């Protein structure tokens, strides 16, 4: 079954009572696609990143069988960034910073090759 995921491929900075990261790859579309790759022959993603997004991560997507034809890379722009702090229970969090960057003008384009996807 072929699926399409539309959403964020981003950078996150996360603080918990147990540790802190400054800039890691995040975003719903990232983790939906990576998770689906374990059960699906060909997840397809639609998102946008800036020129600061690591080529190694795009290569990882491809290595895992994720179709990245719908991933727009905007030269001269920065990737969406979110920063948050999770509380002791890990169920609640506060957003510390949101920088829309490329997401502000994102116009999702569905490639023709995605037209036969089931979901």
Model-derived segments and spans:
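Active-site metal-binding loops of divalent metal-dependent hydrolases
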Residues: 7-9, 28
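Alpha-helix C-terminal capping segments
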Residues: 33-42
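Conserved N-terminal subdomain of the carbohydrate kinase-like
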Residues: 12-19, 23, 41-118
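Extreme N-terminal starter segment of soluble prokaryotic enzymes
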Residues: 1-4
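Short catalytic helix/loop segments, enriched in acidic residues and glycine
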Residues: 19-34
């Amino acid at each position: 079954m072929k699926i399409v995921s539309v959403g964020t491929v981003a950078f996150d900075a996360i603080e918990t009572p147990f540790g802190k990261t400054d800039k890691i790859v995040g975003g719903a579309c990232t983790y939906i696609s990576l998770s689906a790759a374990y059960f699906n022959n060909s997840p397809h993603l639609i998102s946008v990143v800036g020129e600061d997004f690591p080529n190694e991560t795009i290569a990882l997507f491809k290595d895992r069988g994720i179709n990245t034809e719908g991933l727009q890379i905007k030269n001269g722009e920065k990737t969406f960034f979110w920063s948050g702090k999770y509380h002791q229970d890990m169920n609640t969090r506060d957003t510390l910073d949101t920088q829309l960057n490329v997401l502000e003008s994102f116009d999702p384009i569905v490639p023709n090759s995605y037209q036969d996807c089931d979901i």
